[in-house]
């Protein structure tokens, strides 16, 4: 794919390129490559990726992605990658993921949550549907699990973070509903200030404990609902966060979703402060058939008084070939800055020929 973005008052003209190759080998294995180029008058950012998937047997598999980036105007190079082992059966799932992102890794046509980090994230879920499960007319399965996460700073090797997600309770119901509870001890060593939603957390070492409840009804029903609620200590204070979702899907062609998210900080940061940030989301999906869809999305954020909406028309005119028309609108009004608005119109056509 090749795309050019014209020069504006705030940015120079930019050329984009994405190339992808993938090939199956053996009966259940795959190897592929991806190249991205972002070119501006100041220089180019080039990303080179190889990826692979190996099916060892019915239960076990390994997949990996390795990426190298170079930015020509700074001559900085970086690397990121992960390797993941899965062992999944009807009775359990075990996995181990090892990942690394170096300090100078810079994928300007992609997204990463952080740089300069090494992550080790194993996990295990146990699936029990046996005779000792009570209330079998109501309960389908008991699926406890543990999902620890460990992180080191890649440039120094210092241990900086751990989160020990432990789900002693996870219940799947015969109705399609679910309920889960987790308790999570967290250790974090911040090397620089951290600002979640306008709250400043000073560098230092923190230990805190959070509780987590997840519940939901059968999402295939006419009306479905779910809740994601967390509470507990948070760095040097407390945090309550919740996400409520309500979906209305009267027929397969129509789906409407309303979502409300709230984060309530209590005595958090330096200096200690309390605040509440709300996020409202509305989403609609309308399908004439599986190949022609109109999708709308609206979001309002109380943190910066921002509002944004997106309307997308998608037509799959032949298998894996699409025509898109997209309209984006965004605005935010946060004092003392004046209100700012952005609008984008995008038209895209893709064609895939299989040989």
Regions from the PLM with identified roles:
Residues 43-47, 260:
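Contiguous transmembrane helix-bundle modules in multi-pass membrane proteins
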Residues 53, 57, 62-355:
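Exposed, low-structure sequence patches enriched in small/polar residues
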């Amino acid at each position: 794919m090749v795309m050019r973005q014209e020069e504006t008052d705030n940015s120079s003209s930019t050329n984009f390129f994405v190339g992808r190759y993938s090939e199956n080998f053996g009966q259940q294995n795959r190897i592929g490559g991806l190249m991205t180029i972002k070119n501006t008058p100041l220089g180019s950012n080039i990303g080179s990726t190889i990826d692979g998937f190996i099916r060892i047997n019915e239960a076990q598999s390994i997949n990996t992605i390795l990426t190298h980036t170079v930015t020509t105007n700074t001559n900085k190079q970086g690397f990121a990658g992960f390797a993941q082992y899965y062992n999944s059966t009807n009775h359990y799932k075990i996995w181990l993921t090892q990942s690394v992102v170096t300090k100078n890794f810079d994928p300007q046509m992609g997204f990463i949550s952080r740089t300069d980090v090494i992550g080790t994230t194993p996990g295990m879920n146990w699936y029990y549907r046996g005779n000792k499960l009570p209330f079998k007319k109501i309960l389908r399965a008991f699926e406890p699990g543990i999902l620890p996460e460990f992180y080191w700073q890649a440039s120094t090797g210092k241990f900086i973070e751990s989160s020990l997600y432990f789900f002693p309770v996870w219940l799947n119901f015969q109705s399609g509903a679910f309920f889960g509870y987790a308790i999570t001890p967290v250790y974090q060593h911040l090397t620089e200030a951290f600002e979640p939603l306008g709250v400043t957390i000073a560098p230092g070492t923190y230990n805190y404990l959070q509780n987590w409840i997840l519940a939901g009804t059968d999402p295939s029903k006419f009306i479905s609902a779910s809740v994601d609620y967390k509470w507990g200590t948070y760095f040097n204070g407390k945090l309550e966060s919740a996400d409520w979702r309500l979906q209305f899907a009267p027929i397969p062609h129509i789906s409407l979703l309303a979502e409300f998210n709230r984060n309530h900080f209590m005595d958090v940061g330096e200096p200690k402060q309390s605040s509440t940030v709300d996020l409202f989301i509305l989403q609609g999906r309308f399908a004439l058939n599986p190949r022609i869809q109109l999708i709308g999305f609206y979001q309002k954020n109380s943190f910066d008084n921002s509002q944004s909406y997106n309307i997308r028309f998608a037509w799959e005119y032949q298998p894996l070939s699409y025509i898109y028309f997209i309209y984006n609108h965004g605005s935010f009004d946060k004092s003392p800055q004046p209100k700012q608005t952005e609008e984008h119109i995008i038209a895209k056509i893709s064609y895939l020929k299989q040989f």
